[in-house]
Curated annotation (Swiss-Prot):
GO molecular function: L-lactate dehydrogenase activity; L-malate dehydrogenase (NAD+) activity
Role: Catalyzes the reversible oxidation of malate to oxaloacetate.
Record NCBIfam families: MalateDH_bact, PRK06223.1
EC numbers, comma separated: 1.1.1.37
Keywords carried by this UniProt record: NAD, Oxidoreductase, Tricarboxylic acid cycle
Pfam families: Ldh_1_C, Ldh_1_N
Species name: Bradyrhizobium sp. (strain ORS 278)
Entry superkingdom: Bacteria
Family: Belongs to the LDH/MDH superfamily. MDH type 3 family.
Name of the protein in its database record: Malate dehydrogenase
């Protein structure tokens, strides 16, 4: 039985980590694409040579032509300019929008049936642009944001309570930026909601608020520490979880930047919400109830994403006609 083909568009730190994880999880063969000659070829060869040690069979190739994407089952897009210290995700908009137009055209031509995961920032605007540029069905194009943000939230909570991360569930909704919405109401430890844990004396509301703020600034914290780059291990692991749910029809409930067309009162926009990912792509949007401060925070986050999308429309008005 032929292995699935996974195309990684962008061969930087995240791309390389993705390629290794695909092999370790035996998800399929890998094509690494990048415009920098030699980089995808070199990384592909390096990772392929780790396979005898790690014990997996997969074929790795590097390419500088979009033709290499031909018939890919999954495309994961990391191409674009990385975030640097002092640079907001929004500052990246103009440069990376052009990249998404080029990548979208390549996917449309060579991998029109693929499930596409976008990681490029500013995420919510870039996945919107990528879907428009590629013309793929919205349910087959998603953004990796909520899985990562929720993982950070879960890690911080597990560390606070000194429990296994496996026993912590948490959802982060909204845009992938400073206005993201970590939902304490729907976050639990062994099924016990965070508000109840506060009442039980396990922690204080002030401490939970600090963890929420740290989650919102999780990416910036790493950028400031690294000084010359941004996070790549956790983002790659998050995208692989999404790809695996699609390839193996696991139907996991994952928070992703998904296309909304009326859900949550939002239309024609990608925003982070819980979705079910299976072999058909986004198979269901989980429209949870939001009220009070949570609803206000979500609406504020949606407004921030809308601002980015509006900026995209001004920069590349031709995207609207696709």
């Amino acid at each position: 039985m032929a292995r699935d083909k996974i195309a990684l568009i962008g061969s930087g730190q995240i791309g390389g980590t993705l390629a290794h994880l695909v092999g370790l999880k035996e998800l399929g063969d890998v094509v690494m694409f990048d415009i920098a000659e030699g980089v995808p070829q070199g990384k592909a060869l390096d990772i392929a040579q780790s396979s005898p040690v790690d014990g997996f069979d997969a074929h790795y190739t590097g390419a500088n032509s979009y033709e290499a994407l031909d018939n890919a089952k999954v495309c994961i897009v990391t191409a674009g300019v990385p975030r640097k210290p002092g640079m907001s995700r929004d500052d990246l908009l103009s440069i990376n929008l052009k990249v998404m137009e080029q990548v979208g055209a390549g996917i449309k031509k060579y991998a029109p049936d693929a499930f596409v995961i976008c990681i490029t920032n500013p995420l919510d605007a870039m996945v919107w642009a990528l879907q428009k540029a590629s013309g793929l069905p919205a349910k087959k194009v998603v953004g990796m944001a909520g899985v990562l943000d929720s993982a950070r939230f879960r890690y911080f909570l597990a560390d606070e309570f000194n429990v296994s991360v496996e026993d912590v569930t948490a959802f982060v909704l909204g845009g992938h930026g400073d206005t993201m919405v970590p939902l304490t109401k729907y976050s639990t430890v062994a099924g016990i909601p965070l508000p109840d844990l506060v009442k039980m004396g396990w922690t204080s509301q002030a401490r939970i608020d600090e963890i929420v703020d740290r989650t919102r600034n999780g990416g910036a914290e790493i950028v400031n520490l690294l000084k010359t780059g941004s996070a790549y291990y956790a983002p790659a692991a998050s995208a692989i979880a999404m790809a695996e749910s699609y390839l193996r029809d696991k139907k996991r409930v994952l928070p992703c930047a998904a296309y909304l067309n009326g859900e949550f009162g939002v239309k024609d926009m990608y925003v982070g919400v819980p979705v079910v990912i299976g072999s058909k792509g986004v198979e269901r949007i989980v429209e949870i109830e939001l009220a009070g401060k949570d609803r206000e925070a979500f609406d504020k986050s949606v407004a921030a994403v809308q601002g980015l999308v509006d900026a995209c429309k001004k920069i590349a008005p031709d995207l609207l006609g696709r």
